[in-house]
Amino acid sequence: MSSLEAFPVLPVASNSGQAFRETTADGYSLGGFCWRHQVPDATRPLVIINAATSVRCSYYARFAQYLFAHGFEVITYDYRGIGESRPASMRHFKASWTDWGALDFEAMLQRAQRLFPGQPIDVVGHSFGGCAAGLAPSADQLRRLVTVGAQFAYWRDYAADSRWQLFGKWHVLMPLLTRVFGYFPGKRLGWLEDTPAGVVQDWSTPSAAYEQRPSARALVDLPFARVRARTLAISLSDDPFGTVAAIERLLGYFEASERSHLRIAPGDIDESRIGHFAFFHSRFQPRLWPIALHWLQQGQLAEGTPGRLISPGA
């Protein structure tokens, strides 16, 4: 097992990737970006980055460039209704969490297999993006999976000291405003991107099982069990969404995968705060990004990795 100290801090290129459009199975056009090396290599892994709910793919550009600098091909993209994939009007635009995984992420897998034939496919999923990784019909093609704060927002799993505040914000106020506007106007509130009503309905439904969320009820079966990727779930101890219970709830669906849950406290890396979003901030390139990088490269944790294992190799 190698050490995290073996990873040099490489300069991250300033390019934003090559823009592309990809059409889903139901005919929707998605926008995204691709970092591709000039010299083809059938053994070079491709990483698809699945964003958190209503977070633009541009948020992950620096992390994508970091992976590219370490030899990966990388795809980032926006789910339907978000960023590069936003429609002309958000009012009553139809999209759901299940659409984001079963149609949008699936379209990226199809693109990967078409343009990078035979190359290993890995995924990094942030928040709901980790859940989306298990919803695509072709998810059995994944080699390795890294999730960060990945869960599907069951309110009782929120951190006890902020549970009722989060419940009021995301499970009362958000759906109420969505009924008024026909979508959630997150941008004008400064909370997140504007969000389709169907996604809000999935998020705010207070059910402990994903199959009980509105958009999942029509699924004949859940594709999660098809995933056999070697999986690392990273959680942060000061993330009020990504509690141990929340992370383990989602991990339980990936029953055919070898799963490890690494929990990191800010103090483990001499920081006072990390939270739900900051893992992908470039200031954490030297201390957090190598954890994901090593897993993508080797399928295991490096010696000296900060944090503690909650469920190693479950």
Protein language model features and the residues they cover:
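N-terminal cap/lid segment of alpha/beta-hydrolase-fold proteins
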Residues: 2-39
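Alpha/beta-hydrolase active-site loop
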Residues: 94-115
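Active-site glycine-rich loops that stabilize anionic/oxyanionic intermediates
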Residues: 44, 49-55
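Short alpha-helix in the alpha/beta-hydrolase fold that links the catalytic acid
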Residues: 229, 242-253
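Short beta-strand/loop motif that positions the catalytic acidic residue
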Residues: 227, 233-235
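Alpha/beta-hydrolase-fold enzymes
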Residues: 124-211
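Catalytic active-site module of serine/aspartate enzymes centered on a nucleophile-bearing elbow/loop
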Residues: 264-314
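Conserved alpha/beta-hydrolase
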Residues: 57-89
